[in-house]
Design a protein with these regions (language model features):
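FNR-like FAD-binding dehydrogenase module
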Residues: 1-508
């Protein structure tokens, strides 16, 4: 395609989120000269998702392209309701038509959809609740046995959950056209659109629903576009088209995103269309279950041949009758002793100092304490721990209900291996958080940072805590105890961040 240089227009779109850096792409041949750029800033955490910016961006893009490169006479652009054919060919046969040996092999594969070079099977040796039975939050310390895993403090364990038996049963009730005993084969139509590696071998439909399709996902707009295309019942088709339209995005948000309505629950609301979904469209409508990352809470030397994770079981209510359940955390809570699960290790974001004489300040409320349990226990096991070098600031609601690993911390403190500072937000009338304890220890913290080159690590929920902790270091530690002006205090913390002496690992 040729274009005069003075005709060239270019659009640029930046993808990002509230907690991440913005990245952007520009596609341009070297001979092109950019004369104008329309920049659209996109936030994936917007209430309406990427569609809040994608819609006007696409409208602008196609208008510019059509003005520069008009379609041939008689050709018309495809409208938004056009749905492309499925990416792959999906076929199935019943188990009665398969060779017995092949059927046995397919059904005997425990986890056919997880393909990782460093994947290992770990056995559950303890699934312990660390919070009291009366506490609203169920938190689990999951201990797994394995001699094949190598990791360092700060690394994360990747876990891929399964759908609940209840949801799997509901899936086949809502979509009776699919036989749980059938064997499915996925083949490519074009080499440009290869079949994902986990789907390249035949697999059991039941295992696919149990282990691959994310039944708990919140469906996005494209799901409703496809469903509207497949719908035959006019009443359902109209509603699906409304949810798929630009004008219906606020209604879609109120129907799906705000109450956290799952894909399976949406299928239940459109029973006629659900019962007619063709097999070819199964992998267009459903997304794969994603592996979850958990900070490793164990120590290679302190817990040999084991790996531990600390998991808050997600359960909350919206306007919907059924409570909202986190897929992975609730699956973990059901794991029984000796259950073997596939896991693998990824490098974490925390980089702890190798010099054991450098003081380390750790702030980890709630399950944010997990990576620090790994690091502190490792230092203790190697005989390198000391109260003058390890400082843990822990926060929770009640001293007797959700003080995770309480006896371990108190024992380390008694042995002079750890300086422990705790904040219990509900044990007294006035709420008390880790940032309040940081303020109280401002002189100590400034001395550690300014004179002893201490490192700071912050882990936990990303909602308010990380920003408030950072503000406390700027205003009370550097500004108060260090007597630095606000600008200098801010630059001091920024320099720590640049040098890797202030590290944060948070999650939503």
């Amino acid at each position: 395609m040729e274009a005069r240089r003075d005709q060239l227009k270019m659009l640029q779109k930046g993808y990002g989120g509230k907690h991440g850096d913005i990245t952007s792409w520009v596609l341009c041949e070297q001979w092109m000269i950019i004369l104008s750029v329309s920049l659209y800033m996109n936030d994936d955490q917007h209430d309406l998702g990427v569609d809040a910016v994608v819609d006007p961006w696409l409208k602008d893009l196609w208008a510019k392209l059509l003005s520069l490169f008009p379609l041939p006479q008689g050709a018309e652009p495809l409208d938004r309701s056009h749905v492309y054919a499925p990416r792959w060919t999906v076929t199935c046969v019943t188990s009665q038509h398969l060779h017995k040996g092949l059927m046995t092999m397919i059904q005997g594969t425990e986890d056919p959809f997880i393909i990782k070079e460093n994947l290992i099977k770990a056995s559950v040796i303890e699934n312990h609740r660390t919070t009291s039975e009366s506490h609203f939050q169920d938190v689990r310390l999951l201990r797994l046995s394995t001699s094949m895993l190598t990791y360092n403090p700060g690394d994360v364990l990747m876990v891929t959950p399964h759908n609940s038996a209840e949801n799997v049963k509901k899936f086949f009730e809502l979509l009776p056209q699919f036989d749980p005993d059938s064997i499915v084969s996925v083949t490519e139509k074009s080499p440009d659109v290869p079949v994902p590696i986990p789907l390249r071998k035949p697999f059991s439909m039941k295992k696919c629903v149990e282990q691959f399709l994310d039944l708990s996902a919140i469906p996005r707009r494209y799901f409703f576009e496809l469903m509207a295309f497949l719908a035959e019942l006019e009443l359902e088709k109209e509603k699906l088209e409304e949810f798929a339209s630009s004008e219906g995005q606020e209604d879609l948000f109120n129907y799906c995103n705000r109450p956290r309505r799952t894909l399976l629950e949406v299928l239940q609301d459109f029973p006629n269309t659900s019962s007619k979904i063709p097999l070819d469209y199964l992998f267009e409508l459903f997304t794969p279950i994603k592996a979850r990352a958990f900070s490793i809470a164990s120590s290679p030397h302190g817990h040999p041949n084991e790996v531990h994770i600390l998991v808050a079981v997600v359960k909350y209510r919206t306007k919907l009758l059924a409570p909202r359940l986190g897929l992975c955390s609730n699956w973990i809570a059901t794991l029984n002793l000796n259950r073997r699960i596939p896991v693998w290790v990824k490098k974490g974001s925390f980089q702890f100092p190798s010099d054991t004489s450098i003081p380390v300040i750790m702030i980890g409320p709630g399950t944010g304490v997990a990576p620090f349990r790994s690091f502190i226990t490792e230092r203790v096991a190697l005989g390198e721990a000391g109260a003058e070098r390890l400082y843990l600031f822990f926060g929770c609601r009640y001293s007797r209900q959700d003080f995770h690993c309480r006896e371990e911390w108190l024992n380390f403190e008694r042995n002079g291996q750890l300086s422990l500072f705790v904040a219990f937000s509900r044990d007294q009338e006035e709420k008390r958080y880790v940032q309040h304890v940081l303020c109280e220890q401002a002189d100590l913290l400034w001395d550690l940072l300014n004179k002893k080159s201490a490192y700071i690590y912050v882990a936990g929920n990303s909602k308010n805590m990380p920003d408030q902790v950072r503000d406390t270091f700027i205003s009370h530690v550097c500004g108060g105890a260090g007597e630095l002006p606000e600008t200098s205090a801010t630059k001091f913390i920024e320099q720590l961040e640049l040098n890797g002496r202030y590290q944060t690992e948070t999650w939503s």
